Amino acid sequence: HPDNVSPAIFGNLSASCTTDDNEAVTVTYNVDERFNFLALIPNFETSTEEARKVMPKEILLKDALYSLSRLGAVIKAFETYNLPLLKKVMGDKIHEPYRKEIIHEYDKVRNICQKIDSAAFFISGSGSTLMNIVSDEKNIEKIKTELAKLEYKWQPILLKVDTKGTLVID
């Protein structure tokens, strides 16, 4: 899948698709380096196969429009470090409502993050890792303390955006 490989190769945020001629096309968008991505990695896994099985065969047009209509604003928020905008427009009705059901403690983890510090919260790929964008690194310890009270072990890891991608060193 080009959408899995392109961020590692190009860095930043990328969007990939396959054309009608079966050509892979990738475009990249700059992401402001001030973003703090907090990966929340649990001590359990969900398989991509399992995550695909919970998806409905069809989605409502209003749900597709809800998610797709926000895309431009989400990209702009990432480019400009606009946390208030990101918080308003980050939302998904295509896969998250279904895939969250196979991620233990999803709602509890989301509630902890939203209570303490969350500009955006989403499932990373098909799961089971969750991603929380924090505005202040100082809040990571508070989140970590609350996560430790849950049944499953959640390891928070602070990540910064890779703006360069893969580098070839001679």
Identify the function of each model-found stretch:
Residues 78-170:
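Glycine-rich, charge-dense phosphate/pyrophosphate-binding loop(s)
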Residues 18, 42, 132-136:
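Short beta-strand-to-loop capping motifs
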Residues 9-11, 32-35, 66-72, 81, ...:
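Short gly/pro-enriched beta-turn/loop segments at secondary-structure junctions
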Residues 1-35, 121-123, 127, 131:
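Alpha/beta catalytic cores of group-transfer enzymes, especially the acyltransferase/condensing modules
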Residues 11, 43, 160-162:
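Short, solvent-exposed coil/turn elements at secondary-structure transition points
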Residues 39-101:
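Active-site rim beta-loop-alpha module in soluble metabolic enzymes
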